[in-house]
Amino acid sequence: MAKVWSKRFDNALDPFIEKFNASIGFDRKLILEDLDCSIAHAKMLGKTQVLTSSESSQIINGLELIKVEYLEGKFSPGLPSEDIHYSIEEKLISLIGETGKKLHTGRSRNDQVGTDIRLWLRKEIDKIEILITDLQKSFFNIAKSNIYTLIPGYTHMQRAQPLSLAHHLLAYIEMLQRDRERFKEVRARVNISPLGAAALAGTKIKIDRQFTASELGFEKIYKNSIDAVSDRDFCIEFVSASALSMSHLSKISEEIILWVTDEFSFAKLTDKCATGSSLMPQKKNPDVPELIRGKTGRVYGHLQALLTMVKGVPLSYNKDFQEDKEPIFDTAETISSCMKAMTILINEGIEFNIKNLSDSVENDFSNATDLADYLVGKDVPFRTAYQVVGEIVKYCLKRKMLFKNLKIGEFKKFHPEFDEDVFSDLKPHNVVKSRNSEGGTGFVQVEKELNHWQKKLLL
């Protein structure tokens, strides 16, 4: 099949180079967006009388028919068409004849593909935002039932201070909220129309860029035709936002993987979200969080690929930009599938071992800060209190004891301000309850946080 640009050349493309150059194998994913873009363009050409009303209607009807045939499985774009744009144009010409050749008046593939990608990304971002919200709701539902369930908090993967499990889960909701906000910000910059910028310099054809932008739901148009076709920063922003969101999913995954080990035993996997071993019959493997953790690197790789793609590319459009599509397509699919999988895992795949969680905070030194705070409440300088408690920890470790095993006389050997009420302060429930600074893990603060998210998530 002859290329639309073939009259300029004396010889045909080398067959391998033809396949190497083609993008139809992956940009056919943009078929519906390309059809919508072309329909809006054809309407505009009719409105501005570049085409007659009859020609505009004929083209629009032809494009609508192609859409129907595609949705019914009767039209499948592919080689020898070079890309989705030519594939549709060739199909249109075969349906309506010479009038179909007028569709491309006043535009270039450069602004056309930029428009298609933005339309596609806009839809994907909207889907991802919904998926993030669904995951937030899943965490919320578990959190509201576990305000008084305690869990060890860690720094440097060492026991630090006890926490409300609800507070721990609400931390994930906060992270996911920032992810949602980033996607909203990306969407705002995606939602700008390049259509009408043509190849790079605009066009002498009488067009109405504001009309096509409005038809396609864009907020505004690019003000500079060169810029409109010269950058893929919006693609990079999308993958960057996705990479950050995946980093949060990976963090959550890592914690779940640890929690379900025999060593931690803070939770267990249900049969719905675990697999077995081909050799070891006792195994129950956390494949879902492991896969999410692994797929995070995949999105990081796409981000690096796009950053490298645009590095040092001069104005304006360059063929390098053909390499933008597979990274964003795969990124969208990856983050969407991981969000769905994590939501199912949280809803159906994990059960917390409340007894083990409770036992774990009863048998460690994570209340050491509270012992120091007790002395601070007795007007002892914090640094002095800190050093005193350090000595007590060392004393207990040598004797394989915990604070709760000491007698008041032993406490007083380290500082005279210790009294019987110290034992109440050291109980894990009271330790957590006392952390009532704004945003803290104290039960009153956690309830406030839950009320905030109940309204925010419209629950």
UniProtKB/Swiss-Prot annotation:
Keyword Lyase included in the entry's annotation: yes
GO biological process: arginine biosynthetic process via ornithine; L-arginine biosynthetic process
Pathway of action: Amino-acid biosynthesis; L-arginine biosynthesis; L-arginine from L-ornithine and carbamoyl phosphate: step 3/3
InterPro entries to which the protein is assigned, alphabetical: Arg_succ_lyase_C, Argininosuccinate_lyase, Fumarase/histidase_N, Fumarate_lyase_CS, Fumarate_lyase_fam, Fumarate_lyase_N, L-Aspartase-like
Catalyzed reactions per annotation: 2-(N(omega)-L-arginino)succinate = fumarate + L-arginine
Keywords: Amino-acid biosynthesis, Arginine biosynthesis, Cytoplasm, Lyase
Origin: domain of life: Bacteria
Subcellular locations according to the entry: Cytoplasm
GO terms for MF: argininosuccinate lyase activity
Classification via CDD domains: Argininosuccinate_lyase
Protein family (similarity comment): Belongs to the lyase 1 family. Argininosuccinate lyase subfamily.
Protein's name according to its UniProt entry: Argininosuccinate lyase
Gene field: argH
